[in-house]
């Protein structure tokens, strides 16, 4: 199959400014500089990492920190997520309705950092089973100790959390630390303030027993406060063990450990360990070459990590401690050793946190399972194996870092310097785009590219030579009103209409071409009826209707000709007669239509699927979350309109017969025996591309790292051992090598012959579930014809060069 590659699309992801982990440590929130917030599901190794939610917040209000607290009393299983802003406001992020709401109006003073008070009275004898796995943090308090969120796992304590108002401390630019109550009310309630000090309050943290508050400021001082009386207990001069005078030092980060140790990171690149009872210096390390922006601790509190402006993550370990050791010495006799560093980021690191991979739930709802005996047999024959990940295991904490290069990396806590970190999102903030092949404009191929506040219609030019290159030319650009952030967009199959939605509402445009004018391409706006803003939108296959998924959790269908609302759907888990039910389901974030115009598949942000019959204008089927995982990509097969193909974040593929309301025959036979090479498919699946040939039953599944060809008409083959990541050879393959005249052993000749054997085997017959790795981050893949595809990619170093912030490694002239 011919691949035409294009890298001319602009791609500029936004830096990550803050991280926070959920109360059960299974999710990580990442706030970006452009005001957006992402929720990531934590997974061992490369498989299962998934950006579950993206909420588009206010781009004009820069987020400074995040705090995530548990709140089961008000029916929020994920807890409540708060963010502070440089403009002095505090927002709560609604993870169900996908919106940002202000809970504290701007106080007129920048808030640099927030910290949640731990809940006292925690019982260390209680071991929790959370999120489907047995906690392996034996006797740990589950306190992560990330100053970015200040959150602790507080599910187990003597007094019910429903009876306790959490206290949120905010370090403010005027030198004051303000305390707020988090109750069941929507707004935060002001509680009290600590005395104002000279300089700016830049960092804040609580002691594990919540009896003391520590604050760091721009005057180089660390202050200890009594949380009850709000009186100053003592103050520390941060420059004592570090570099520079105290008046020049900014204390950016503080971390309080259970062993009565306070850790500080400052603008001189120094990390200092203090006796938190008396304020005396225990240890000072000046290993960073720039500001220390963030600190985090392992759950056992015998390891501390620091990161900052030099792009390094550094590990310090309590001398004499073992993995998971709880025998912490008195703070006065502790010695903290520098162990080493890992440098995965090209730019400043802004945030660290610690999270825990979770186990997967039962793969299927019972009503669509094959017989249990068959399921058990297949699962036994092909178990899911996570051992290849080497260091990442279910229930074992891992460190997460993020920064100005827009990347997120995961590290082993216990074997930090032994293994390379895992790149969680190789293509951060991937550009949404949609291709129209054979448009109504002389069969011109068009590409719709969604920017932050712009929509570009590009013309695709495919090279006729053997270079395999494709280029683009801009035809029109549409800017959103008042430069508002665009949430979603769509273009019709003919290219004649396109639409987008910002946080105010949707807009529809018509694209026209007139060969006899100076500017042949023009755009006219079509006036839509009053509609809520959309999370997703799509045109019907015949281009006669625009379908949008409103933020009010309803689905609206608009006639393109009359511009009138035709009908509205309300997704539901149960069948309803007569009046539409009140919207109760999570917001719809993905829409797909069949090529014959009969079916609409709507997928919510958690992976539930609602199938609607557009002919009868009724909901046809509800499919609950598959494999306990989110849906990453989907689509109707163009030549079998009843076949809905679904890909999940756990690297499973399902083919449904929507008309019969059941799994298709292929899924019943093969879902549990997918090749291991596909279960270990690198990167999160981003999309599907179906072959346009009427005789084809194949689909290309792609991530930012690789492509995989799946043919539903071919049998699912067993793995060959040389396809596995560990590189070990099976006895079968060794036998084949001997038959080819290759002796066992090592050496370049043997490796060359093995490579030739693999290449010859792959060229003779294409395997089903064949995986082709990509050299650069892939943004989009789409079929141009039966035997050719368009691959839009971008070398990561080209992206790095385009970022606003300078990389850490700067070339010095003359060196």
UniProtKB/Swiss-Prot annotation:
Start-end of each WD repeat: 11-50, 58-103, 146-190, 196-235, 244-284, 287-326, 381-421, 529-568
Assigned keywords, A-Z: Developmental protein, Nucleus, Repeat, WD repeat
Keyword Repeat: yes
Organism classification: Eukaryota, Viridiplantae, Streptophyta, Embryophyta, Tracheophyta
Biological processes, Gene Ontology terms: embryo development ending in seed dormancy; lateral root formation; leaf development; leaf vascular tissue pattern formation; meristem growth; meristem maintenance; post-embryonic plant organ development; regulation of auxin polar transport
Protein's recorded name: WD repeat-containing protein PCN
Location (main, coarse): nucleus
UniProt xrefs under PANTHER family: WD REPEAT-CONTAINING PROTEIN PCN (PTHR45086:SF1)
Function in brief: Involved in auxin signaling pathway. Required for embryo development and meristem organization. Functions in the auxin pathway, integrating auxin signaling in the organization and maintenance of the shoot apical meristem (SAM) and root apical meristem (RAM).
Region of interest (Disordered), residue spans: 137-157
InterPro entries to which the protein is assigned, alphabetical: PCN, WD40/YVTN_repeat-like_dom_sf, WD40_repeat_dom_sf, WD40_rpt
Originating organism: Arabidopsis thaliana
Residue runs in coiled coils: none
